[in-house]
């Protein structure tokens, strides 16, 4: 065995560790815009289902730190789907099924030099075909910074309702997302690749409807 190989391997590992050690803690002061490039949605009720392709969509999110650990954060999703069958809006050929807005206050805690866990509670407003529920929301996640790449894994859920005549409609969304932000130069905006897998569960009286959807996005993030 060539003795130089272990030496080079150890040197490479030490270099990687030193580069990782120099990485800064992830920032929670940022704004981000996402353009949703592809996705679909499936509406299911009583064993029947209908699928819809995404026509267009965008997302906004951001955060602002107050002190060392407390933060305010928010996110918004707006998604339009092809609706040639007129499932939602009659004569129009697109439908807004599952927009979502969340604004919360929380905190982040470092668990390693480059990794923070965070959580926030606040106001959530999901929609279904123009009907908006309002209630409380919760988001938890982890964010890790590795030199030129910042990865964020997050889970958002809510318990909301609204009135339709004398009936109460519950809209309970759950979203699981992954964002990977790539920095090409110091202090420059970052390229963000994102994926979201989600569901909206709707219930009115004894009737239930499930709305499952996922999408891929590309965006721009500016951290401060």
Residue spans for each PLM region:
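Transmembrane beta-strands of outer-membrane beta-barrel proteins
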Residues: 29-36, 63, 73-77, 118-122, ...
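Outer-membrane beta-barrel architecture
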Residues: 61, 104-106, 139-143, 177-181, ...
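Short glycine/proline- and aromatic-enriched beta-strand/turn motifs that initiate or cap beta-hairpins
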Residues: 19-82, 101, 215
């Amino acid at each position: 065995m060539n003795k130089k190989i272990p030496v080079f391997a150890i040197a490479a590992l030490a270099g990687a560790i030193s580069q990782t050690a120099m990485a800064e803690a992830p920032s929670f002061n940022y704004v981000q815009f996402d353009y949703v490039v592809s996705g679909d949605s499936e509406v299911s009720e009583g064993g029947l289902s209908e699928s819809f392709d995404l026509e267009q969509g965008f997302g906004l999110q951001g955060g602002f730190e107050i002190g060392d650990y407390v933060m305010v954060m928010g996110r918004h999703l707006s998604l339009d789907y092809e609706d040639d069958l007129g499932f939602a809006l009659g004569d129009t050929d697109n439908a807004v099924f599952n927009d979502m807005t969340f604004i919360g206050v929380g905190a982040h805690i470092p668990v390693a030099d480059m990794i923070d866990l965070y959580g926030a509670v606040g106001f959530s407003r999901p929609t279904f075909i123009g009907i908006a529920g309002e209630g409380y929301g919760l988001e938890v996640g982890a964010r890790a910074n590795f030199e030129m790449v910042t990865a964020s894994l997050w889970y958002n859920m809510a318990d909301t309702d609204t009135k339709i005549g004398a009936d109460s409609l519950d809209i309970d969304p759950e979203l699981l997302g992954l964002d990977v932000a790539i920095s090409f130069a110091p202090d420059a905006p970052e390229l963000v690749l994102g994926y979201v897998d989600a569901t909206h569960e709707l219930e009115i009286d004894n009737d239930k409807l499930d709305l499952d959807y996922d999408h891929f996005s590309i965006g721009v993030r500016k951290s401060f």
